[in-house]
Amino acid sequence: MLLRGGELSGVRRVAVLLLDGFGYHLLHQAGQASSTVEAIRNGDIGTLTPITATVPSSTPISLASLACGLPPGRHGIIGFTVRVPDSGDLVTHIRWDGEPDPETWQPEPTCFERAAADGVVCTVVSDGAFRDTGLTRAIYRGADWTPAIAPYEVAEETIAALHRGRRSLVYSYLPDIDTAGHFHGIGSPEWLEAVAEVSEAIDGILTDLPKDASLFVTADHGMVNLTERLHVDRHPDLLEGVETIAGDGRMRYLYTRAGADAEVAAAWGAAVRDRAEVIGRDEAIGRGWFGPVVTAAGRERIGDLVVACRDTFAIVGVEGEPPHVPRLIGQHGGLTAAEMAVPLWTYRNG
């Protein structure tokens, strides 16, 4: 569906470069900082196609779908943070210390496991600090890990990994654009600098891409600059009937006390007004937000109520979240086109 017939004919080596936070609708602004991005946007090199991120449009969910080839309802990594049904604890998927057990939490075979079983040498190129995390164990099983942080290092290690074995699959990750967007905002000088630096990784890979290789560049989500926030910690009435708040600022999960759904939905609906939609878990599933199938385990992890923020609004001030979160300028997780549309750029050498 994404690749035309024969597009991979003769290709023995594939590199996938994931640029965190690099939404499709950001390409126009990004082109100001990178002639490579501008050429990609204009169709001068490779093939650019808009595709859709996951719901929620947040990093661990989309990375899991990419790494497993499954929608969130199947792989079960279905929120930035979710409540563990058995214990009631919160798991933050990007800071996962190994509990709950990653192989049990996400039991589906990864793309790397399937490829490795067919003789493909698989490598992940990313920050070494992520190597032994729960998320890595859950979604990158089957791949070797090569540490690299700076864009030029990622490019060099990607090329080196492509040359391993007769057939190779390399997945590389760069967080720079997302980080700059969170702390400084889309379009800020810092964001444009991050785009310029990351584009050097694209240039480096293109320069040395083997003749029998293809490069795919994509993202996990886009981003919006916030203009309005609801601070839950300033509204104690919103905590009545709520046991736990999870998710992220643009897509909140509310785990309610038994029988409190209607009361909580009414209170939150009055607080967010037209800035967000408050719906029940079953309605969110019925709309297909998490894919055509949601497993029983996945269903349990979704909040009893789901609060999907519109426009440039977010819900912050949630107990247990880092104190800098309410100050973040760029955020994502919601359903807007700016968050959901991501690029898929393909380039074949030779």
Predicted regions and their residues:
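Feature captures the catalytic ectodomains and active-site-proximal regions of enzymes
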Residues: 1-350
